[in-house]
């Protein structure tokens, strides 16, 4: 029998509900102990577009806190939607489209709005190249799949960035391909574990066991 005790907070990625938002299912997840939603926003930085501010009010009504993950190029236009919404607790954005001065500008903007700020990294982007910036952050989002769509397989190349992230004093969120058969490989190294399709496919009793540490 799989060990379902995970001593890290689970964040449910909303991507599996992209084409059919299911409030009743989310209310069930909340009743089971889920408290954190991972909310992906995409533009042409990746080969997909998803949520653009939809459902935040409903998520707040249910009681969720929201981590917003911005996989975007047009950050100047997209960011304001999330800066002042009460449900949004943390905002991370990808470093790859931007130079260092631009990244610093957006970090300051997010901090000024009172949100926790993070930078997101593809597993092919060396974290060490952004060391000084990472030291200013509340958290980092480390991608363990190529960004842009759900249901992909976990890529162990993320361990390079994971090892580097431990040298800094910020929380670590890992995102992509996490399922019951690999969650224990990374749980001791991170603070937040993002699960999408791997979470929604669980039996309810499995979700409840997995979420015990959220309560």
From Swiss-Prot:
One of its GO terms (molecular function) is D-ribulose-phosphate 3-epimerase activity. Transmembrane segments: none annotated. One of its GO terms (biological process) is pentose-phosphate shunt. Substrate binds at residues 13, 69, 175-177, 196-197. The keyword Metal-binding applies. The active site is at 40 (proton acceptor), 175 (proton donor). The keyword Isomerase applies. Its cofactor is a divalent metal cation. Pathway: Carbohydrate degradation. A divalent metal cation binds at residues 38, 40, 69, 175. Keywords: Carbohydrate metabolism, Isomerase, Metal-binding. Its EC number is 5.1.3.1. It catalyses: D-ribulose 5-phosphate = D-xylulose 5-phosphate. Gene3D superfamilies: Aldolase class I (3.20.20.70). Pfam families: Ribul_P_3_epim. Belongs to the ribulose-phosphate 3-epimerase family. NCBIfam families: PRK05581.1-4 (NF004076). HAMAP family: RPE. Catalyzes the reversible epimerization of D-ribulose 5-phosphate to D-xylulose 5-phosphate. This is Ribulose-phosphate 3-epimerase. It comes from Mycoplasma pneumoniae (strain ATCC 29342 / M129 / Subtype 1) (Mycoplasmoides pneumoniae). The gene is rpe.
């Amino acid at each position: 029998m799989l060990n379902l005790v995970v001593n890290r907070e689970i964040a449910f990625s909303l991507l599996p509900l992209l084409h059919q938002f299911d409030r009743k299912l989310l209310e069930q997840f909340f009743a089971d102990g889920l408290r954190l939603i991972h909310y992906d926003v995409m533009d042409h930085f990746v080969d997909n577009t998803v949520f653009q501010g939809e459902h935040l009010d409903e998520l707040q009504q249910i009681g969720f806190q929201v981590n917003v993950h911005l996989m975007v190029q047009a950050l100047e236009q997209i960011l304001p939607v999330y800066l002042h919404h009460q449900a949004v607790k943390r905002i991370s954005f990808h470093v790859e489209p931007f130079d260092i001065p631009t990244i610093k500008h957006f970090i300051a903007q997010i901090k000024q709005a009172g949100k926790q700020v993070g930078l997101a990294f593809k597993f092919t982007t060396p974290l060490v190249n952004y060391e000084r910036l990472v030291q200013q952050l509340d958290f980092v989002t480390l991608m363990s799949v190529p960004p842009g769509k759900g249901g992909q397989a976990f890529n162990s190349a993320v361990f390079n960035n994971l090892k580097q992230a431990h040298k800094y004093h910020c929380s670590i969120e890992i995102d992509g391909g996490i399922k019951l058969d690999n969650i224990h490989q990374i749980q001791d190294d991170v603070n937040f574990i993002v699960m999408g399709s791997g979470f929604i496919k669980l039996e309810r009793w499995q979700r409840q066991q997995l979420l015990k540490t959220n309560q």
